[in-house]
A protein has these predicted regions:
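Glycine-enriched, solvent-exposed interface loops adjoining structured elements
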Residues: 1-245
Length: 245
């Protein structure tokens, strides 16, 4: 998002305060006023919910795992991992997509049939907060890559370099969501928490949410003739032999 589309936590708190009839203050994040104390908590809740509401381009990150034959096949996820972007998992050394994420039942089937010595292409699942692959131990030198949504929706005030976290603890920190989006969502949260009607505020939020989720990334030209889309995982991008179960 552009630099002009974001603002500090203090500015967002004052912006929403004015909209709901509260006088702005110099440093709302340090204020002990009960209204601002409540708004600080709700601002963090709003940001956490927005992370999971849409695969925002600004939160996308790439993760890479290079395997060794000494690995267990269980890998720690990044500290800021929220969730994987579906169909972005690839094993790049052999240029094939990862199979998964597998359910518990499918995982039990793989292990029960013992395909470890067969030419099975890499399967994965998430369990116990870890990224697991099969077969395990894996072959040496696999290059496993996938995209994920980061929980780091809060940026530091200074760029030396910027750091990102999942919680606002100071008023000069900057939520990287569009300022109108997060302001309108905080307003909904605040009105709801204080028992006021949220109909208009919710409609305003829904409008900006729909606009931003529809325009933050490019889109293909629609073909009314039913043209073929690119099959990310299919016969055109996996080998003819040496894969599968």
């Amino acid at each position: 998002m552009g630099i002009n589309s974001i603002m500090s936590a203090n500015d967002i708190l004052n912006r929403v305060a004015v909209e709901i009839g509260i006088a702005p203050v110099t440093d709302p994040y340090s204020s002990t006023d009960p209204t601002f104390v409540k708004m600080k908590t709700l601002l963090n809740i709003a940001g956490e919910e927005l992370v999971n509401a849409h695969p925002w381009e600004i939160l996308l990150k790439q993760h890479q795992i290079i395997t060794t034959s000494a690995d267990t096949g269980i890998y720690t996820l990044p500290d800021d991992f929220s969730h994987i972007v579906n169909q972005t998992g690839w094993e790049r050394s052999q240029r094939v997509p990862l199979g998964g994420p597998r359910t518990s039942q499918e995982w039990a089937y793989l292990k029960g049939r013992d395909f470890a010595n067969s030419s099975v292409y890499i399967q994965f699942r998430f369990a116990d907060g870890k990224f697991q692959i099969y077969p395990a131990p894996p072959p040496d030198g696999l290059d496993i890559d996938f995209e994920y949504v980061s929980t780091g929706w809060v940026r530091s005030a200074t760029a030396d370099p910027f750091t990102y976290t999942d919680e606002i603890i100071a008023g000069d920190q900057v939520p990287i969501f569009n300022k109108t989006l997060i302001s309108r969502y905080l307003k909904v949260k605040m009105l709801e928490a204080t028992g006021f009607d949220t109909t208009k505020a919710q409609a305003d939020f829904n409008q900006i949410f729909a606009f931003l989720t529809g325009t933050e990334k490019g889109a293909p030209v629609l073909d009314a003739g039913g043209g073929r889309g690119f099959p990310y995982l299919g016969y055109s991008n996996i080998p003819d032999t040496g894969f599968g179960l």
